[in-house]
Amino acid sequence: MKLHTLLDLRGNIPTFVHVSHGKVHDVTVLDHLPIEPGAFYVMDRGYVDFARLHRFTTHSAFFVTRAKRNLDYTRRESRRVDKTTGLRSDQTIMLAGVKSSRLHPDPLRRVTYHDAGTDRRFVFLTNNFTIPALTVAGLYKSRWQVELFFKWIKQNLRIKAFFGTSENAVKTQVWIAISTYVLVAILKRELKVDRSLSAILQILSLTLFEKTPVIQALTSGKTPDSDGRNFNQMTLFDL
């Protein structure tokens, strides 16, 4: 089973989730993705399909992705870059492959960036020509928030093992976990709670059967003990 998620970085809240079988190719999820005009969609190169990427252009939306190593293209224009920022090139290109040029006939922007921290070179593709080249690299870096989202789900909502083996049982557990994440994220934002999502979830789980108002439980200044005991529980032996 695969879980494809569109994460809105303005609040780190999933706005689109598609559950598919493990054998389904990642790129097919783009057929189900609702495209919002003016929005940026950041994805890894497993989703590179030029016919599907061209849909973003026709819907007045933008994408940022990594180019595949065997990309066949011709350079139309090069712009100056400040190499002290890690940028190596900022080009306007046209796809040169017989099939790819037919599937995506419009120009693309190719940005090359060197990450000094990892000593790696990244080549990005986008259909946006107005934002700074460094912003293109920054947008792709923000894709890491999706990885953090899945890590949070696995660590805090216990999807390390499934309680059932049927398709319906697995999907139900996944949707419950995602719904819990969204509710906690909304709660944090609406109540302006200065705690991590993990801390909020832990407090809620420990005060689940109490009559304490949620806002009081989250802003009281008390935190669960490091061993996970309820901080409202009385001490059995007061020595």
For each of these PLM feature ranges, what is it?
Residues 1-239:
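Single, function-defining residue in the core of a domain
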